[in-house]
Swiss-Prot record:
DNA-binding annotation, residue ranges on this chain: 967-981
Magnesium listed as a keyword: no
Stated name of the protein: ATP-dependent DNA helicase P143
Motif segment (Nuclear localization signal): 692-701
Keywords: ATP-binding, DNA replication, DNA-binding, Early protein, Helicase, Host nucleus, Hydrolase, Nucleotide-binding
Binding site for ATP: 919-926
Chief location category: host cell
GO molecular function: ATP binding; ATP hydrolysis activity; DNA binding; DNA helicase activity
One GO cellular component, as annotated: host cell nucleus
Enzyme Commission number(s): 3.6.4.12
Pfam family, one: Baculo_helicase
Amino acid sequence: MNSILSRLFRDVTGDEEYAVNSLRDANRLIIIDTDTGTRRLLEHVSNFRRFLNTIRSDAAGACARHQRAARHDDEEEAPPAARVSFAGHSLVLENNDFCVFVKPFLLKRHYDEIKNYLKLDRFFKSDNPEHTNMCVQAGDYCYWPNWPASQAVSFTGWQLYLYVEFGIVVESTVPIIHNRRLGPVDLFVFNPRTFLNIEMNLSTNEAPPVKLFVNGKFDFEKKVAESGKAVESLFEIKMANGATATCKMIANLVNSNKNLFEVIRDNINLEECVTTPKYRHIIDVNLTKLRQFAHDGAVLAPPVERAFRAPTVTTILSASSENAEVIQSEIDAALVKVREGMVKVMAEFNRSDDPDLLQAYFKESGFKNFHFLLFNVWKQITKRDKKSFRETDMKLFFELVCETLFGNDSDALATALVKCEPFTTRGVATFNSLCDHWHCFKGVNPYTLLGSYYGAHYFIYLKLTSSDAHECDDPWAFNYKNAMECKVPPKALGEAFFIKVENVVTQVTLVFNGEHYQIVKKDDELYKLVETNPYKLQNIKFNNWKYMYHTKYGVYNVVTDDFYSNCPFLLGTTMPGTFKRPDDPPYLPEAVFAHMLATSAEERDILRTYHIAKLCRDVKMVKVNLGTVNLLGDCAPCKLDARLRLNDLFRELWNLDDDSLVTLALYVNKLRVEDIVHNFKCGACRASVQERKCRCVQKIKINRQALKTCLIFDLFVGDPELTQLMWMLIFATNKLYINTALIVTTSKLVAQHAHFFTKEHIKIAAILHRDLHKIEFVDTLMADVCNHDAFLAYLQHAVANEPAAAPAADNAVAKFYAHYANAANILHKYKNLWWDKIILARDSDTLSSWLTRFYLRVILSKMDVQNYPVAYLTQVVEGYLYFKRYTNFNHASSYMLMHFAASLSVPTDYGRKAVYLPGVPLSGKSTFFELLDFLVLMHKFDDDTHTGASKETSDKEVSNLNSEVYTINELKKCSESFFKKHADSSKSDSKSRKYQGLLKYEANYKMLIVNNNPLYVDDYDDGVQNRFLIVYTDHKFLPHVRFSGSVYHHILTKQYPQEPMVVDALKDSVRVFLAHVVRYQREPQTGLVPYKTLLDSDPVHQHNLTRLSVNNSPMYAVIYILNIKTAPRSANTFVTEEKMQEMIGYATLHLKSFLHPSFTQYNAAKNINAGTARSFVFDEKILLQQIKDKFKNNYDERGCKFNNLTMALNKLDININVPQFKC
C-alpha cells in the first residue's frame, strides 16, 4: 500500500510550507504514516474523499457506495480478488479546519476521565436520546456513532475545548478508517449542516467594537463567566485600516454552521492573523498562504501600489449679475415675509422676538428644507424673464441668499454654500426646471405660505423634543401623525400643509394628506379636517415632475440625491419609487464605481482566463482520483466515473478556440510560450536588448495541431522527456533553438529522437492530432505512452505510412501574438486571477455566492475599499452582477439595462424608446420586471394583442398614468399607433378613477415589452424601428443545473442554476446598485440618466433591429434579401429601375419565409396584397415605390436609376437566410 501511495501523492517534509498545525490551505490535506513518519500531500479534498471511499470497504469488488447501489441486482458474479488490503494500516490525517469535520472522538483513557462532565445530549432532540448520545469504544478510542449524518464537530474546536476545559492535549491528527488503533470506523463528516465548536467572538479593538464573528450568545466583555470559566484570547488580527481585532473564546460548546476560519480567510480587510503562543500547538493561521497559491514571484513580490489617480478638479464660476439689485431686493423681501409666516405659527413658543428664527430653523434641521427657499425666491425673480438670468446670475443669487442669512456665522455660511453646489454644477436650465416643480397658489403670498410651512415644521420639532411624553423616531418627521399629535394650529396646517385644492373645470377636490394629494369628497374625514377654502386650479397637470417627487420617505430630489420633508407644493397624486433610502450607508467612491463599470467590457475574458486554470486544476485532481481507484480499488463504477470525468475535461480543452488555447499554453507551460514569442521574432528583434516597435510579432503563426498535442501531453501525460520532444514539433524550424535545447538536455531519449521529431514535425503533429481527436478515453493515451520504446516505434511506423502534405493555412494559429498579448494583459491587470485560493469554488457555493466572492477578490481588490463594510460591498456587487447574469455577461446589453432601470427614478420619459425583451422561456425576463415591481411603480398588463382601443378599466388607466414603467407581458401583436403612443415622451391624458372626478395627469412611464415569441407591429415603419431597444436572451435558468465551479462554463452552455426566491434575495442589492448608477451616471448638465443611445454602436443590437424589421416589413425584408446598401459617390455605381424591379420580383418569392405569420392575416385587405385574402400576393409596384421612398436621396427620376447604390444583381447573390435574434 505504501508503494502505491508514493505513486499517487508526493512526499512533503515538515518545513515552513507544510508545517504541522499550520493552516495554510483550505483544500490541501496531508496523510501521515505514523510508522515511518512519511507525510504525503493530497492537493484537493476530493482526492481524500475518493481515497476514503476506495478504502472504506476492505472487501473485494465494488466500493461501499456502489455496493449499496447494486444490492438489488439479481445477477451473481464471483467476487474479484482484493488487490490491496487496508486493514491495520497506520495512516492518519492532519487537521485542516476548513474541511476536516469529524464525529466526536477521543482516546479511551481520556474519555474515562471526563465522561461524567462531558454532556453532549443538550444539542439534540431525539425520540431515543440514549441511542443518539451513546458513546462506544473502537480500538483505543471512544466515539459517538449515532449522531445525525449532517452533524459533526469542528476538530480544531474540539481540540481547543478539551484543552481549555479539561487540560487534555489531543493530537492534531485523525485516524483513518481501518487504522490499527481505530478499526473499521469512519470518523469523517463532509459538508456538515451544523457542527459543535468552542464558543468564540472576533471583534475589533475599536470604540465601539465591531463584531466580525460570533457563534454563541456569551457576552465577551465580561472577563469571567458566571460559571467561573475564563475568557481566553486565541488570535490577534491586524486589519487593513490599521485597527486590530482579537478573537476570544470561552470553554463552552455551541452548535453552529458558522466557521470562524472562513471569515478570517474571506474578509479582505483582515491582513494578518497571529495565534496566541499558548495555542500554537493546536492552530497557526498563515493568511498569505491561505489566500494565495505559491508561484514564481508571488511570495517575494512587494505589495503593488495602486496607480496614482488625478484628483477631480472643478472650476469655480465667479458670481456676477446685471440684476444684482433686483435679486438682493427680492431676497430681502422674501426673508421678511417668510419670518412673518413662521412667527404666526410659533406664537406658542414666544419666538416672535427672535431675529434669527429662520436661521435657527435651518441650522437645527440640518438645512433639510433650505432649498425650498431657493426655489421659491428664484421662481419669483425669473417668472417674467428667465432668459436674462444665466449661470453667473444664479451663482450670485445663491451667494447673496447665504450671506444675507448667515453673514455673521461662518460655519453656517459654509454649510449653506455647500448645499447650493449641486445646482451650480448642473446649470441654470436644470435649476429653472427644479423651480418649475414648485407650485405657487394664487391669492396668497408664496413667501408667507412658505414661512407658515417652516413654522409648522419647527413647531413639531420643538414640541416633540420638549417632553419625553412624545415617542418619535425622528422629531423632524413632518407627517399627518406628528402634525395632529403636536396640535399645530389648524389654520396654519390648512394653509401650509393639509392644503385643499379644487379643479374648477371638473369640480374635483383634492387634499394633501401628508404624503401626496388625494381626491376627497365632502363627507371624507380629510376634507372635514381642513376648514380653509380650497385653492382654485385650472388646466393643471398633476405629476408634472422631472427632478422632484413625493416618496414614502419624503420629497426626493434627483439632482441633489437627497430627501426633503413632505410638502404640499408639488402637485402629485402618487408616490413613485426611488432607489435611494435616507438611512443608506455612504456611497462607494465614484472611482470605485467607475472601475466596476469600466471592467464590464473585459469580464468575459477575465472569467474565461480563470476557467482555463480551473480546468487544469480539475485535470490534476481527477488524474489522482483515477489513479486511486485503479491502484487501490476494484470498483468498476468508480473507475468509469473517473474516466468519464477526465474525458469530459479532455474534450473541453481539446475543443478550445485559438484565444483560449494560447491562454491554456500560458498556464500549462509559460516558459515555452515566452520562448515562442522570442524565437519567432525577426533577427533584429531577437538581437536587440531594448524592445523595438516591429510588426514581426504579428506574423507569428503556430501549427495548431502541434500546439494542441503539446498541451495535451504536458497536461495529461506529464512525462518530462516526452513533453520536451513534443514541444520540438513547434520549434522544429528554428535550428538555433533546437541545437541549444540538445546541448542543455540531460535526457538520452530526447537526444536520440530529436532529429526524428524536428524532421517529421508536420507528419507527427498530424498523426498525434488525428489519434487524439478520435480517442475514446484519454486515459488510454496515458497508459500507452508509459512504454517509450513502443510509443516511439508506433510513431516511426505511422510516419513512414503518412503521405506528405503541405502545411494548410487553416491549421495555423494566425493571431498567436494577439492572443498572447490579450491573455498576458488580463493576467497583468488581475495578478491574483490564477493564484488566489479564495476564489476557488467550494462545495457550499452557489453561482451567486461564488461570483460575488470572485468579483470582490479579483476586480474590487484593485481599489481602496477598506473603509467600507464587506456586507455593503457585497450588496453593491450582487446588484451589479444581476444585470450581468441576466444578459449572459453581454457588456452592451447589461450596461443599457442597468441605465434603463436607473432612469426610472427620474420620472420623465426623455428617452422616446421602448425596451423590448424577447427571449427563450426561463431566460430570466420575468425576474427582471418582478424586481422592478418591487422598486418602482409598475403598471403591468398581460395581453397578446394591443391595438389603439383601450382594454383597461378607468382605474387601471389612471394607475398606468401614475406609474414609472409600463410593462406589457407576452405581447404578440400591436398596432403602430399604440406602440408610438406609449413609447413617446409626451403622454399627458385626462382620466378618472371609478366614482371619482376627471383629472389631467402627466404620464412619466417608460415602456417595457416582454415576450417569448417575435413581436408583430402592424404598419411597421422607420418611426417604429427608431423607438426600439432590443435585448435578446437565449440562455436558461434551470432547476436541475448545478453550479459547476466556474461561471464561464455556464456562459458557454447557456444554462444557469435556477436559484429559489431570487427576487427577494436580490431586490435590496439591485436597489443599492441602481442608486449608485443614478448618483454617478447622470449627464452633467441635465442630471438625467442616459440609456437610449447606449446601443447605437452595438452590432448585436443593430442585427436584432434588422431581424425585427425584416420580420415586420416587406420593404425591410426586400432590402435585406437583396442586400441593398448605399455606397460613397466615389464608387460611381448605379442600379437601373428596371433591374431593381426585376430583383424585387425574385425577392418576393421568399418574402413569406421572412415575414411574421401574422403579416398576411392583418394585411389581407390592404393595397400591398395583389391577391385575395386566401391567396396573398405581394404587389411589386408598391414595394418598388417603397424602395424609392426609402432611398429618395439616391433615386434619379430623369434617369430612372438609383445612384451610389449596391445590391444583388442576380438570383445567386440574393440572401435567403432568415435572420434570427442573437445575443
